[in-house]
């Protein structure tokens, strides 16, 4: 009988080899679990980091949208909302005014909102505006605008590009992401119809002498009120009552 080598077990295997086999086995199991997880992933799971996705359903769910309009087109009061959804300076102003008006007066059919993308920079358009417009073509423009506003901190940490906007689009329930991407990519092409529409929105702001801050143009049976410089909810509500 040959003597047992101290570097081997009685069965002839090396201890180190056993550990290698165990580690490889564990890695294979982990890989298999990962593949199964990806294949069974529910739609939207990869977008868990998007802030406000659940809120969009509560605020905007069931409210009619058509292009830039949110609410009933026969609503007696119309509010043109001039906003730069990329501007972190006026994040709170947007969140303090739009959701309350939507959940109360827009949902009840008393008010309709029209979204006007208004850049607070030297450029007439911004990349997020194209994301809003692409979503609006499916009737989800307001959800996209809301998510852009809610996720401005994340946009500042990461690069605000098509990939980031695609993440926001993926968090909007029932919106066709493939169609959104096609519309977005077509829209950002120079000279596109979407670009012309955004330029027209900027021209309208200039025509109405909207200053470099969020504004509301409130129109109703009793006239029009123009609210400048990031008006709060109280000022907006007062204007609604004035023109109603």
Q: Which sequence ranges carry the predicted segments?
A:
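A short beta-strand-turn-helix
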Residues: 60-77
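C-terminal cap of thioredoxin/glutaredoxin-like
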Residues: 1-40, 170-244
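Ser/Thr/Pro/Gly-rich low-complexity linker/stalk segments immediately outside membranes or between
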Residues: 40-55
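Alpha-helical scaffolding within the catalytic cores
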Residues: 64-65, 98-100, 203
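Conserved strand-loop elements at the edges of beta-sheets that form or border functional pockets
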Residues: 72, 81, 229-230
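Short secondary-structure boundary/capping segments
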Residues: 69-71, 103, 207-208
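Structural alpha/beta surface segment adjacent to cysteine/selenocysteine redox centers
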Residues: 75, 80-170
């Amino acid at each position: 009988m040959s003597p047992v080598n101290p570097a081997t077990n009685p069965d002839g295997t090396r201890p180190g080899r056993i550990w290698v086999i165990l580690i490889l086995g564990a890695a294979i199991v982990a890989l298999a679990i990962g593949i199964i997880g990806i294949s069974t992933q529910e739609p939207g799971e990869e977008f868990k980091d998007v802030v406000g996705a659940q809120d969009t359903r509560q605020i905007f769910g069931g409210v009619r949208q058509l292009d830039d309009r949110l609410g009933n087109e026969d609503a007696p009061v119309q509010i043109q909302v001039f906003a730069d959804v990329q501007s972190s300076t006026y994040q709170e102003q947007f969140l303090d005014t739009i959701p309350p008006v939507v959940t109360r007066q827009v949902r009840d059919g008393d008010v309709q909102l029209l979204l006007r993308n208004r850049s607070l920079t030297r450029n007439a358009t911004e990349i997020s505006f194209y994301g809003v417009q692409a979503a609006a073509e499916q009737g989800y423009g307001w959800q996209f605008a809301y998510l852009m506003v809610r996720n401005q901190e994340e946009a500042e940490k990461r690069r605000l590009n098509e990939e980031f906007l695609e993440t926001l689009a993926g968090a909007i329930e029932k919106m066709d992401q493939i169609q959104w991407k096609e519309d977005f990519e077509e829209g950002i092409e120079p000279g596109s119809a979407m670009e012309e529409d955004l330029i027209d929105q900027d021209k309208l702001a200039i025509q109405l002498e909207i200053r470099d801050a969020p504004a509301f143009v409130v129109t109703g049976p009793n006239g029009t009120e123009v609210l400048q410089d990031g008006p709060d909810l109280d000022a907006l509500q007062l204007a609604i009552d004035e023109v109603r």
